[in-house]
Curated annotation (Swiss-Prot):
Transmembrane segments: none
Family: Belongs to the 3-oxoacid CoA-transferase subunit A family.
Alphabetical keyword list: Transferase
Source organism: Archaeoglobus fulgidus (strain ATCC 49558 / DSM 4304 / JCM 9628 / NBRC 100126 / VC-16)
PANTHER family to which the protein is assigned, alphabetical: ACETATE COA-TRANSFERASE YDIF, CHOLESTEROL RING-CLEAVING HYDROLASE IPDB SUBUNIT
Pfam families with a match to the protein in the record: CoA_trans
Protein name, entry field: Uncharacterized protein AF_1199
């Protein structure tokens, strides 16, 4: 019987009892001579043996033996029998993709990475990146469709009880308070929130009883205004659970990994800290250097809410100033609600395409609402409403006070326009605009 040959590599080999002996000159995928015998596997199984060269490189995907017949790899990891030109009943190679290394298992079991340590927190917000990609393909259209709607419609359509929600912006800067208030007004409950520098937005949702779990990086602190009395009361009372803890960088890199289509991202942070213990990260031994490296799992929120300076009706959105994590967050979330200070013609967007950090095909809803970040800051447009924030912090020291606040500013109004009238109307808003433009000095009640 003629010895089996790989049609692609034309490697010479001889059949020996119990296996295929590597002949002189036979080489691995990196061109190094193979050593020793390659055990012959049972027909059409995934356990085909692989020869190794003196550097440990496997013959693997370059030459395999199926039932004493040669095989070719064609296309994307598919194998054809060289005689019948039909696919084998089982594919014999598999690939495991990681951001820093590709392990080729050649049909044999892959040696597991050495996990040196792992955090105690639950893994939430994670899914298989390939499943996420498939979901996006099936559920998000690239059609240039008009996505404008009201805040009420956006929340009703896309935010449901128990979802994982992430809010863009930074602390008290560029946050979608109109959507936050609408979530409360519609009575959404049981949310898990990503607390990556989420302060006023997260705090208001917690005070209203909408949040059940938090992944915390920087939360509950109102900077010089002090710690949040409402969030502290909710956490200490057990109504809200902080399920994991992260650094700001780590939580943002979770979104980055998701945006890149990766299951995790490696970094040299968190190691040796209590933050790591409270996270769901893992520490492995780097297969290159042998040193420890942290694997930070990706995070795919169910819904992201991002406020921008301008957008067109299709969702092409522009942010003036620092993006923080919003570039990554927009690409990591399954659904994206964009609120904007103004809707502009698409031609206006095209005049400065480098500003368009969020393209239309990522967006599910576009909500136009001037001053939507109030009482927080919108860079270049209006300043923090310190008087209103002080009123909120004072009232939410007690449950009764929190109910009074929400009755006045959320349940007692029909929409955000009415809310803006209640907080002071155009006169108050113009004052905040002048302060942001350095034409008037701010007054800080907490001094």
């Amino acid at each position: 019987m003629a010895p089996p040959r790989c049609r692609r590599e034309k490697l010479n080999s001889t059949v020996a009892e119990g296996g295929v002996q590597a002949a002189d000159g036979q080489r691995c995928q990196r061109g190094l001579p193979l050593l020793g015998a390659v055990p012959q596997a049972a027909p059409y199984t995934r356990n085909n043996g692989m020869g190794e060269c003196r550097r440990g490189h496997r013959q693997g995907h370059r030459a395999e033996v199926h039932d004493n017949r040669p095989a070719d790899k064609v296309g994307q990891g598919r194998w054809l029998n060289s005689q019948t030109r039909r696919p084998c009943r089982k594919e014999v190679t598999s690939f495991q993709f990681f951001p820093f290394l590709i392990f080729h298992t050649g049909g044999a079991e892959m040696e597991p990475l050495e996990i040196m340590d792992e955090g105690e927190g639950p893994l939430v917000g994670w899914c298989d990146p390939d499943e996420f990609r498939e979901w996006v393909r099936d559920n998000k259209s690239r059609e240039m469709a008009d996505k404008t709607m009201s805040a009420e419609e956006a929340v009703s359509n896309f935010i449901k009880d128990g979802m994982y929600v992430a809010s863009g912006g930074f602390g008290h800067v560029r946050v979608s308070m109109n959507i936050i208030y609408e979530i409360i007004r519609q009575g959404v409950k049981g949310l898990t929130m990503a607390g990556k520098t989420s302060v006023h937005d997260l705090d208001v949702l917690m005070a209203a009883g909408c949040v059940e779990k938090v992944e915390a990086a920087y939360s509950f602190g109102h900077e010089l205004r002090g710690l949040s009395p409402a969030s502290r009361r909710k956490v200490e009372g057990g109504e809200v659970k902080v399920i994991t803890e992260w650094s700001n960088a780590a939580l943002q890199w979770r979104f980055k990994a998701a945006a890149m289509g990766l299951p995790f991202i490696p970094a040299r942070i968190l190691m040796g800290t209590d933050t790591f213990k409270k996270s769901s990260a893992k520490i492995i031994r780097d297969p290159y250097s042998g040193k420890p490296v942290t694997l930070i799992p990706a995070c795919f929120p169910d819904v992201a809410i991002i406020h921008v300076h301008r957008a067109d009706k299709y969702g092409n959105a522009q942010i003036d100033g620092i993006l923080v994590e919003d570039y990554e967050l927009a690409r990591a979330a399954k659904r994206l609600i964009v609120t904007t200070e103004e809707i502009v013609p698409t031609d206006k967007i095209r005049e400065s395409p480098w500003r368009t950090s969020i393209p239309y095909f990522l967006v599910d809803a576009v909500v136009e609402q001037p001053f939507a970040s109030h009482p927080c800051n919108m860079p270049l447009l209006y300043y923090f409403d310190e008087e209103h924030i002080a009123e909120y912090l004072a009232l939410t020291r007690t449950e009764e006070g929190a109910k009074e606040y929400f009755e006045k500013y959320v349940y007692g109004v029909n929409d955000f326009w009415e809310y803006l009238e209640v907080v002071g109307g155009s006169k108050r808003l113009e004052k905040l605009r002048r302060i942001e433009q350095l034409r008037e000095r701010p007054v800080y009640p907490w001094r």
